[in-house]
Design a protein with these regions (language model features):
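Flexible loop/N-cap segments at domain edges
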Residues: 282
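Charged helix-capping and loop-helix junction motifs
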Residues: 133-136
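Short, well-ordered beta-strand core segments
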Residues: 118, 147-149
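Short beta->alpha junction loops/turns
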Residues: 11, 69, 94-95, 153-154, ...
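Nucleotide-state-sensitive switch-loop elements of NTP-binding domains
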Residues: 2-7, 12-131
C-alpha cells in the first residue's frame, strides 16, 4: 500500500483536489480524512467519487499529527491489513503539521507500506495572510512537501503566480511547484503523484508552539430561507461573528438543501448532494458563538453543540 498525503491550510482546496485525483487515477484506493471538529462535512462529497474505487475513513475528533497520532497509525495499519488497497490518500486537518504526520507514518513504514512524496496545496488569495498569521504551521506544510500546488489561480496573472512561486522556493527550494489550475491537468499528471516515493528529505522541526484557530461546530441545524443564509455569510466575511477564516456546512434553508463554504473573505453556496441532517463548522479567532447560533432556527438551537479550543499540534 502506497500512501499519498494531501496537505494544505484551511480552505486551500484539498478535498476538491482529491475528488479530481480520484476521478483520474483509475486505481483501487482508500481515503483517510482527518476533518477535526468539522462534523464530517466533506466525507459525503469524497464518498460519491470513491464509492466505486475505494472507501472513506473519517477521523473527526483528534488531529492525526498530535493527540490522535496513535489512532491514526492504528487506522493506517488496519486499512493496510483489512482492506489492502493499492493506495491510501490521507487528507489531514488544515491546521496539522505535515512534518509530524510524515514522522508518524515513517514509524510504521515497511515493505508493504510505502510513503509517496507529499503534496501541499496553498490558496493564492490567502497565501500572504496565513503566512503572516500562522508562519510556523504554514511554512511547515510547504517545507515538508515534495510538490506544492497553488490553487484558485484561474483568474491570476503570470506576475502574481510568479511572485507566489518565488516565495515558495525560498521556503522549499527542492519542491516541484505547480501554479496552473489542477482542473486542467491531464490524467498522466495525476498518475505521477502516485509514482514518486518520498525521498526522505529534511523534516522541519518547530522551535516554538503556535497559537492556532478555535473550532466551533453545530449539528442538526437549519435556516428559514436561502436569503437568510446569504445574509449570514455576508455578515460573516465582514467580521460580524469574529475573525472567521474558514467555515463550511450543509443544511436545509426553506425548501432547499444547500452547502456553504467560506475561505478567508470569500464564500460560495451550492446545492447539497444529499438531504442530510444540517451541520456547520466555523474556524477562527474570537468566535462569537452565541451570535452565530442565533441565526439558526429556534428548534435546532442547542440540540448538539461542540466547541473546541485548539492548541498547536
Amino acid at each position: 500500500m502506497k500512501i499519498l498525503i494531501v496537505s494544505g491550510f484551511l480552505g486551500a482546496g484539498k478535498t476538491t483536489f482529491i475528488r479530481r485525483l480520484s476521478r483520474n487515477i483509475g486505481k483501487r484506493f482508500v481515503i483517510l480524512e482527518n476533518e477535526y471538529g468539522a462534523a464530517g462535512i466533506d466525507g459525503a462529497r469524497l464518498g460519491k467519487d470513491a464509492a466505486e474505487e475505494g472507501n472513506i475513513w473519517e477521523m473527526t475528533e483528534q488531529c492525526i499529527c498530535c493527540s490522535g497520532k496513535k489512532d491514526f497509525a492504528s487506522s493506517v495499519l488496519t486499512i493496510a491489513n483489512a482492506v489492502d488497497p493499492e493506495y491510501l490518500i490521507v487528507e489531514p486537518t488544515g491546521v496539522g503539521r505535515l512534518s509530524r504526520i510524515i514522522e508518524n507514518l515513517k514509524q510504521i513504514e515497511y515493505e508493504r507500506i510505502r510513503l509517496l512524496s507529499p503534496v501541499t496545496i496553498v490558496d493564492i488569495y490567502s497565501f500572504g495572510r496565513y503566512l503572516e498569521e500562522y508562519p510556523e504551521l504554514y511554512k511547515d506544510q510547504i517545507a515538508s512537501a515534495g510538490t506544492v500546488i497553488v490553487s484558485k489561480t484561474e483568474q491570476s496573472g503570470v506576475e502574481e503566480k510568479e511572485r507566489i512561486r518565488k516565495f515558495i522556493e525560498k521556503i522549499n527550494p527542492s519542491a516541484q511547484i505547480i501554479t496552473d489550475p489542477y482542473a486542467s491537468m491531464a490524467r498522466e499528471e495525476f498518475e505521477n503523484f502516485l509514482k514518486e516515493e518520498w525521498g526522505g528529505g529534511k523534516i522541519q522541526k518547530a522551535e516554538t508552539e503556535e497559537k492556532l484557530p478555535d473550532v466551533f461546530s453545530l449539528e442538526t441545524v437549519s435556516m428559514e430561507t436561502p436569503e437568510k443564509l446569504l445574509c449570514f455569510l455576508e455578515d460573516m466575511v465582514c467580521g460580524k461573528y469574529g475573525n472567521i477564516i474558514r467555515a463550511k456546512g450543509q443544511l436545509q434553508a426553506g425548501t432547499d438543501f444547500l452547502r456553504f463554504d467560506v475561505a478567508d473573505s470569500r464564500y460560495t453556496v451550492t446545492g447539497a448532494e444529499e438531504k442530510t441532517a444540517g451541520k456547520a463548522a466555523f474556524i477562527g479567532e474570537l468566535i462569537k458563538r452565541e451570535d452565530i447560533e442565533e441565526n439558526f432556527k429556534k428548534e435546532a438551537r442547542g440540540r448538539k453543540m461542540k466547541y473546541m479550543a485548539r492548541k498547536a499540534p
